[in-house]
């Protein structure tokens, strides 16, 4: 049974990669959720995925809540297992999907964190200097704010993906989907200065035989990582004397929020962000409504 379980998981992960075009990061998360469920099965003496019943699924969810897992985490695990069993049913390895009727209670949707326009200006203004790392940091955050790229997308940019003559970047995004995103003159200027006066100096520190073609490099001349971007942002927030604690992804939220605040069409923002569904983008309309309400209460004499 152990061998069969391993084979089914491997087949599912291959399906996610080859047919669903999921990113390696997403596939790893699926694998971790499946491993967690298998560990629970072993604790409960359930020998195989085929032996899982709806009653066992309810027991599993109850234990997750008793262990105080976040609602979002439970929801993600449930989604993973529902998709896994849907695949097993498709392959005719099991007769039915025990997760089909399992649901988590709906919670209050958390609004995305973002910086106000004044805070964003304060952050970017603090990124001055002409050292290679300072030039890189300025170009990095100007690019994310100008384009709304995910941090993973920004770290994945190659030199040839950026066309400064027309102000666009080519993005290989989530689900292996490709899109072109415009960037403004501030980002173009920052990238140009970084390429001319910073990147080559960082590249010389690389000990690799095959020099990376990545646009953004770390202090050793290798590709900049998402973890590295988080560290740089925290340092930049301190440098800008901003007490707001936000993540690099919050700059993407800021991009979308500021566009909508200034009258951009929701579907245009959807395309720029690379969202497959409009409902994913609509969360930003709640943010802008809150912003409008704050402005009204602050400035209207009879608010």
UniProtKB/Swiss-Prot annotation:
Q: Where is the active site?
A: 150, 174, 249, 252, 275, 284
Q: Subunit info? A: Forms a cyclic heterotetrameric complex composed of two molecules of XerC and two molecules of XerD.
Output one GO BP term: DNA transposition
Q: Where mainly located?
A: cytoplasm
Protein name as annotated: Tyrosine recombinase XerC
Gene Ontology CC: cytoplasm
What does the protein in this record do? Site-specific tyrosine recombinase, which acts by catalyzing the cutting and rejoining of the recombining DNA molecules. The XerC-XerD complex is essential to convert dimers of the bacterial chromosome into monomers to permit their segregation at cell division. It also contributes to the segregational stability of plasmids.
